[in-house]
């Protein structure tokens, strides 16, 4: 079959741009909604533990926040990867095809170059660490202080502590602050 004259590299690249930006938009919505789901899970577990007077129920909180936090982090990383791909690969290729150096998508770089970007990224990292690090850690501390103990619950709590620490470390590592 002969290639169609209607299909050009530029059209293919623009179609790819549209697709990756749509994926990025979808992932942003999903990631942001994960915070609401995490807050709902926290309230549910804390309310249930308080109502039932069973501190062991607090052990559900680190599990829930770790699962939701890893999902949040994975989506956040993909969102950043899409932006980086558009800035460093797709945009410049389209610019070259158009006879202009650089990327035709100015916003992809412009919003990353303001003077308060580093401050915002640090604040966002702290905000991310609260639901996915501080709150589950507080639940574990409350369990250790007020729980009945026992080998298996304490063992589970220590495994959860390791998972929460690993997630918190990854949140800090992935907190991209470079322009």
Describe the role of every protein-language-model region.
Residues 21-24, 53, 116-123, 148-155:
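Membrane-interfacial loop-to-transmembrane-helix junctions in polytopic alpha-helical membrane proteins
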Residues 3-8, 12, 45-53, 60-67, ...:
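Terminal, low-complexity, charged helical segments
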Residues 61-109, 168-179:
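Inner-leaflet juxtamembrane helices
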Residues 39-46, 63-65, 134-142:
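Hydrophobic, membrane-inserted alpha-helices
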Residues 51-62, 147-162:
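Hydrophobic alpha-helical transmembrane segments
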Residues 28, 32, 105-137:
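Loop-to-transmembrane boundary segments
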Residues 128-144, 157-172:
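Hydrophobic core of alpha-helical transmembrane segments in multi-pass integral membrane proteins
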Residues 2-47, 174-179:
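Cytosolic-side membrane-entry/anchor segment at the start of a transmembrane helix
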């Amino acid at each position: 079959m002969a290639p169609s004259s209607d299909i050009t590299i530029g059209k293919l690249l623009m179609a790819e741009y549209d697709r990756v930006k749509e994926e990025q938009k979808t992932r942003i919505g999903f990631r942001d909604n994960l915070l609401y789901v995490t807050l709902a899970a926290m309230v549910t577990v804390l309310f249930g533990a308080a109502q039932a007077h069973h501190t062991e129920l607090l052990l559900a909180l680190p599990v829930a926040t770790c699962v939701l936090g890893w999902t949040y982090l994975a989506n956040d990383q993909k969102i950043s990867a899409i932006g980086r791909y558009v800035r460093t690969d797709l945009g410049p290729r389209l610019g070259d095809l158009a006879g202009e150096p650089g990327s035709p998508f100015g916003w992809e770089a412009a919003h990353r170059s303001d003077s308060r970007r580093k401050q915002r990224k640090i604040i966002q990292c702290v905000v991310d660490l609260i639901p996915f690090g501080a709150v589950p850690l507080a639940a574990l501390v409350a369990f250790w202080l007020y729980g009945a103990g026992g080998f298996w619950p304490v063992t589970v709590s220590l495994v959860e502590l390791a998972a929460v620490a690993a997630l918190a470390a990854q949140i800090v590592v992935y907190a991209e602050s470079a322009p």
